Amino acid sequence: MLINNSKYYSLFLFLFFADLVYSQNSANGRIVDAKTNKEVSGVDIFINENQKPSLTTTSGKFTVQSDSLIYKLRFLRKNYSLESVDVTPQNASNIFVKLAQEKVGSIQEVVIHNEKPKYKNKKENPAYAIMQKVWERKRNNGLDKFDTYTYKEYEKIQFDANNLDSAFMKRKIFNKLEFIFNYKDSTASGKIALPIFLNEAVYENYGENRPSKRTKRLLTAQKTSGFQDNQIITLMAKNLYRDINIYDNTLNYFDIGFPSPAGETGFSTYDYNLVDTISIRGENAFKIRYQPKRTEVLAFQGYLYIDTDSYAVLGATLKSTQKINVNFINGISTELEYDNPDENTFLPRKFVTEIEMTPFSKKKTSKSIIAKRSVDYSEYQFNKPLEDKIFKRTEEEYNDKFVEKDDAYWVKARPDSLSKSEQGIYDMLDKLEQTPKFNRIVKLYETLGSGYYNITKGIDLGPIFSVYGKNQVEGDRIRIGARTYFTRNDPWRVQFYTAYGFKDQQVKYGVEGRFMFNRVNRFTVGAGTRRDILQLGVRLTNDDGIMARTFASSTIFARGENASLSSINQTNVFTSIEPWKNFQIRLDGTMQSIKSANPEGFNLMYYKNGDLRKTTNDSHFTLSLIARPGAKFSQTGIDRHEHGTLAPTIVLKYTKGVEGLFGSDFNYNKLQFLFYKPFLIGSWGKTVVSFEAGKNFNTVPLALQNVIPGNQSYSLAQNTFAQLNYYEFVADTYTTLHLEHHFNGKILSYIPLIKKLKLREIAFIRGAYGTLSDASKAINVEGFKYSAPSEHIYYEYGFGIENIGFGNLRIFRVDFNWRGNYLNRPDISTFGIKAGFQVGF
């Protein structure tokens, strides 16, 4: 396998996450009276945007220290004007401050001392009156007003390793890699920041609102830091950010809802304080400070800048609180600027977001990665005729040469010049790519990250995490697999596995090959075959393809004995295409024979024309329509990496069984539907909805029937019923609904002591209803055993605790499940506990 350059960036993050060391910021100087030049004592010194003084001086000299970077100091003393000094590496020592006297009682005193005025009710608060005007004149994105529009977008994404020091640089892991620190950048306090990734991109945006609504975002230029295949890290970085509208009630960060300070529901979360009137780009603006009423909630603090005449939002700063309860995140900071061409619309001008990420600790001194994304919007044009071909351009999106530009282009395209450290990133990562030691570390990291180990060029072994399993039929099971792998964007791939059970002493296998002819519409063909023991009936809407695996046939820990396994011999051919973005049409042809893998404990025998048969022979075609509107993917090859979004999944499948084709025993028609979607519910968290429905229109034996999916393992399994046994409910016609709400700690944050653990609560309810005809029961030898949840809707409910762990590493979840009805059945479980790992923010 070729070394995958895109993983260098991910490895770089991993290396800097590996060690945690302490570093401190400091500044010192002298304070005098501007008129007399005499030293002044009793001065309150504020660091950065802090609202409480970090020091009150006892003499004219001062020294301040902070766990975070000091970039600004503010000095305030009674009867003196506020003085602010920007701190840089050049002036951090021996800062000379002159304070000018003024009248007592200026508005700045109220602002800096954070003396929040006490009002009998919010209507007495002048900030409330201003925010009411903002809500009354709430603006819409101006792009929707025009028939057509175009604009230019410049995006810069940068990763910096932060809080480094000389001790960190001497770690053994950097032996023979010391040259990377020649590109370091020192902060004002002596800390070291090392730029490790830079991506620049220019987009042309086109839109048409009338007569039909169409948009096109075309990448016209891109420059990356060193490696050629950087797409996955670039899109991973972009996936950290979401497009936000400051007027919305909820702002989406990491698919977690934060209440907007400019939303109509803001006063339920924030306290507001009018602190000043300032000028922004020649416009007078109210400066309103806001902060959350409770620091334990997911919310921001910062400033809103409101036009004094039109009450439009000219800008905003959003900064997370110190107690932010988001995994792997130490802090979020966003600055927004808007243009307001008229009283009803706003246009984005500039967005800058910084995210500080650490793997384990939330201490400010921890080593971290600063991910910064800045976007500049310019060259707006409206109501100009747009040719139809603009919206049909696709080839350039898959052609790297189209976006290659020379240095002269980038000098002109950048709104601001690159810093010296940013310019050095390109050279540093080119050198790193040629270092043998780093490439060896890359290989180890790739193995842990992908689950595959490269043995020679283009061949990987794996997945290594699926080597061992256990079930009632096979006993201990060993599985070894391999795949072809040259690059992330391979247009073809062959996969193979073989497995052996020490109890049944049988060899199993599977092999599949796929080839993609066109990257634009992803026209793909594939074929495969397998002979294996599987747990059928754990999913209603199954994934098609030979290499799709089922968890239950190799579960190590389970509730009760699982004897309901099937021996399957299956061959599949398919073709698929995406005629529109994120909409796939797939046609499968499948030939299979299914029999019980444990005839003594699980009977799949059925009657056909009066004959008793133990093997179900089936040939069928399946047409699948799969829509994923809004989904994001990072590769263009046969296998794509999907990034987490709130995009829905909508699947419609029709299956036609053909009797007589390759010895098939049944004609049948089956229709299935699936809808899955996460929804943000403001500050109350996120609700995940999964709905499935289906119908078999003909009589088929148990091996081809719809099984309401149970879960007898102790692991979490999506879209299954935790308290159902396998094959407990079977249905010709079925509907299921899973509702799961993640509160993000909203309730537990009110409980003393518990709130310090930063646990998050989950509540869920699941239901299933279906019918099973007498004919479908009679066709099976043991049909009397099977029934559908037709008397009542079967339901189970419960709650869970997620975010269990320490520091920033909180990936464990435990669910407590109760069965709601059908309690008089034999061998059921009325209560159960499931646990598992889930990695996310």
Spell out what each predicted region is.
Residues 50-61:
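Short, acidic Ser/Thr/Gly-rich low-complexity loop/linker segments typical of extracellular
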Residues 31-35, 58, 138:
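Short solvent-exposed capping/turn motifs at the termini of beta-strands
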Residues 116-285, 291-299, 361, 365-458, ...:
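Structured extracytoplasmic
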Residues 47-49, 74-85:
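A short, solvent-exposed loop/turn motif at the edges and junctions
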Residues 95-114:
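Conserved "repeat-terminator" motif of extracellular CCP/Sushi domains
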Residues 24, 29-40:
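Structural motif
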Residues 256-258, 382, 391-841:
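Exposed, low-structure sequence patches enriched in small/polar residues
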Residues 37-41, 63-70:
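Short Pro-Gly-centered beta-turn/loop motif in secreted/extracellular proteins
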